[in-house]
C-alpha cells in the first residue's frame, strides 16, 4: 500500500479575518508546520493543496498543488488524487491545515477502517470528513461530482460509503476556524507542556 498525504490549505480564512490560516502560529510555529510534522511520517510523500503564492510554503520543501477550479476542499482532494495517482500511490490521506493536533496514527487507522476504501475520521461524536482517506480510483468520480456543482466533503464520502475511523481524543481534530479556537489550542498546548 502506497499512501500519499495532502494538507488542505486552500481556504480563505474568512472567520479569521481573511488571514491565511497556514501562516497562523500556534506555540510560535505556523499551523502548516504542525500538520506537516504530524502527517508527514505517516505517508510516503506529502504535498500542500493551496491557491495563491506557493512561495509562502518554500521553507517546507513540499510540492504545492493548485486547484483546477476552486470549489472548496474537494477541489484540493482532486488535485491531490491526480498527483498521487501519477506517482503510483494507492490512496491519499488528507488533513486540513487548521487541525494542528491531527493524530500520529491517522493514516493507518483510516486505512484499516476502510480496508483501503474511503474512510473518514470521527472523534467526540463528530465526523471530520476532511480528515479522510481517498483511494486514487475515485478521482474521476470526484471530478464528475465537482462538475455537477457538488462540493460537500461529507456528501462525497457518503456517496462512496466511507467507513469511520474512531479516535478517542476529541481534541485531535480541533479546527482553528476563529480566534477563540486558536486561544483554546494555545491553552491545550500549555496544559500538555
From Swiss-Prot:
Enzymatic class: transferase
Gene Ontology MF terms: GTP binding; metal ion binding; molybdenum cofactor guanylyltransferase activity
Broad class of where this protein is predominantly found: cytoplasm
Reaction equations catalysed: Mo-molybdopterin + GTP + H(+) = Mo-molybdopterin guanine dinucleotide + diphosphate
Keywords linked to the UniProt accession: Cytoplasm, GTP-binding, Magnesium, Metal-binding, Molybdenum cofactor biosynthesis, Nucleotide-binding, Transferase
Needed co-factor(s): Mg(2+)
Positions with a binding annotation for GTP: 8-10, 21, 67, 98
Any one annotated GO CC term: cytoplasm
Catalytic activity, EC: 2.7.7.77
GO BP terms, alphabetized: bis(molybdopterin guanine dinucleotide)molybdenum biosynthetic process
Metal-binding among keywords: yes
Protein family per UniProt: Belongs to the MobA family.
Biological function: Transfers a GMP moiety from GTP to Mo-molybdopterin (Mo-MPT) cofactor (Moco or molybdenum cofactor) to form Mo-molybdopterin guanine dinucleotide (Mo-MGD) cofactor.
Entry domain remark: The N-terminal domain determines nucleotide recognition and specific binding, while the C-terminal domain determines the specific binding to the target protein.
Name the record gives this protein: Molybdenum cofactor guanylyltransferase
Lineage, broadest ranks: Bacteria, Pseudomonadati, Pseudomonadota, Alphaproteobacteria, Rhodobacterales
Gene, per the UniProt record: mobA
Amino acid at each position: 500500500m502506497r499512501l500519499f498525504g495532502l494538507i488542505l490549505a486552500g481556504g480563505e480564512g474568512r472567520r479569521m479575518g481573511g488571514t491565511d490560516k497556514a501562516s497562523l502560529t500556534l506555540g510560535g510555529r505556523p499551523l502548516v508546520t504542525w500538520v506537516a510534522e504530524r502527517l508527514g511520517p505517516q505517508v510516503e510523500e506529502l504535498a500542500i493543496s493551496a491557491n495563491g503564492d506557493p512561495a509562502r510554503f518554500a521553507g517546507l520543501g513540499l510540492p504545492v498543488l493548485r486547484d483546477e477550479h476552486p470549489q472548496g476542499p474537494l477541489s484540493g482532494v482532486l488535485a491531490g488524487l491526480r498527483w498521487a495517482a501519477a506517482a503510483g500511490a494507492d490512496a491519499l490521506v488528507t488533513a486540513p491545515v487548521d487541525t494542528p493536533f491531527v493524530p500520529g496514527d491517522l493514516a493507518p487507522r483510516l486505512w484499516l477502517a476502510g480496508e483501503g476504501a474511503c474512510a473518514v475520521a470521527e472523534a467526540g461524536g463528530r465526523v471530520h470528513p476532511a480528515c479522510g482517506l481517498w483511494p486514487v480510483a475515485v478521482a474521476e468520480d470526484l471530478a464528475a461530482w465537482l462538475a455537477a456543482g457538488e462540493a460537500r466533503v461529507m456528501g462525497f464520502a457518503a456517496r462512496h460509503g466511507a467507513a469511520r475511523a474512531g479516535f478517542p481524543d476529541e481534541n485531535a481534530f480541533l479546527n482553528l476556524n476563529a480566534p477563540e479556537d486558536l486561544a483554546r489550542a494555545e491553552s491545550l498546548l500549555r496544559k500538555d507542556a
